[in-house]
Each structure stands twice: as structure tokens, then as C-alpha cells.
Amino acid sequence: MEILLYTGLGVGLIFASEIGGYIWHRYGAHTDILPFVKDTHQVHHTRIHDQAHGDFFYIAILLVLYLAFLFYLYYLTYISLVLLTILYLGVFFPFIWSYYIHSAYHITDHWLNDYEWFQNDKRIHFKHHEDPTKNYGIATHFTDELLGTFDYAFPINKNIEK
């Protein structure tokens, strides 16, 4: 029974991470709530080969703070190390996946360009660069579909294939 609980928690955290990434991208990187983040992100939108390392740097800082919070929680409550690990990895791995996929979108000769699913995701991503009110998802777009910001229309810039 414990394995089901931990599995459910891990899957839930993956979904929560994706929703958190959407919120960060939509409201952190595209509004004036955090102007320094918006400024960094706008540079990314104007350079096709900019991999947005600055944006991900801020998120990496949040991951370190989250880990510190979990250890503090562990210290206060003595929750199991298994649970602590799931709570961290369920957020950490989706971040790493998003970072990798997003960087690959901006690398001309990336090996993933050989796959149609990646080419489609890349088009969706670059559509966001043309219309910053659409397609906030990075590695998945279920949150965009859920919240009405998904647009599959291909971007005008056809120079993104490879």
C-alpha cells in the first residue's frame, strides 16, 4: 500500500511541477511581477539560439531553496527519507527534462531533430516566441490545453527545422 501512495505522490508532483513551470513562465517571465526575470526572458525571445540559461538559473535557485525547505521539514518532523527523496525528485527530474528539451529546441544540429515529435514540439515552442500569449509549456503542453493557451499553428519562421 505504501508503494501506491509513494507512486501517486511522485506522479502528482510531476504534474504539479509542470503546472508550476507554466505559472512561472506565464506570470514570472511574461509579466512585471519579477522584472529581472522578464528582462532575461525577453532576451531569449529575440535570439533563436539563446537557450534561456538565465531563466533556468532562477528556477535552479528555487530548487535549491526547495531542497533546503525539505531538509528543514525533515529536521522538524522526521519524515521518512524515502518520502523526502520522492518530494525532491518529483520536482527535480521534470525540471531537468524541461531544461534539456528546451535547450535542444535552440540547438540547430541537436540529435532530437531527427524525430517528428520533437520537430512538432519545437514548432509549438517557436510559435510561443512569435506570440508570447500562447504555448507556455516547455516539455509538455497539457497545461496550455487545460488553460486555453495552446496554439498548434506553425510559426511564420520556417528556419527552425534543424
Residue ranges, per PLM feature:
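Cytosolic/stromal cytosol-facing helical appendages immediately following the last transmembrane segment
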Residues: 2-8, 12-58, 73-78, 83-84, ...
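Short hydrophobic alpha-helical membrane-embedded segments
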Residues: 58-64
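Alpha-helical transmembrane segments of multipass membrane proteins
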Residues: 67-72
